Amino acid sequence: YEQRHFVSGLGCLEYMDIKGKRVPFGTDLLFVCEEEPELVAAAEICEDLWVTLPPSVLHAQAGANLIVNLSASNEMVGKDSYRRDLVSGQSARLVCAYVYANAGEGESTQDLVFGGQNMIAENGVILAEGKRFENGIVCSEIDVQRLNDERRRLTTYQPADDSDHLKVHFHLNVE
């Protein structure tokens, strides 16, 4: 349904000037934490998780161990369980943490209802999940070192060349 309003940004990597700063814009971005360089994040949006080859696969192969999904997945009977299985399964397949933030209260319309099913998964295990149709914060600790160690241990996990991805460095106050 997003194709009614958007076009694919796959393979698009440009720079834009926003408030006087040059900012990378595109789908192939890896966000590397300066204080914890083992933490590498990437993003996908909503239905990316539901397609046959989600962008998170390429992000993980390029080194991302934290995938964030900014979603607006509407509610239907049984969809919450299916969505949970997708998040859990993707984090298991990619040996990564997967943070899923769904549209919620105040974002529904007469056409669609959003329940705000927010989740954090690590290597196939749902670590935290918010209650649907309630506002709140979902948080959990993620063991990035364990994920990286598991990737090195597995012979089935195949990293790929990351030259298609631009690394954007960021600062995180770690206490």
Report each predicted region and the residues it spans.
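Enzyme catalytic cores with a strong preference for nitrogen-chemistry domains
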Residues: 1-175
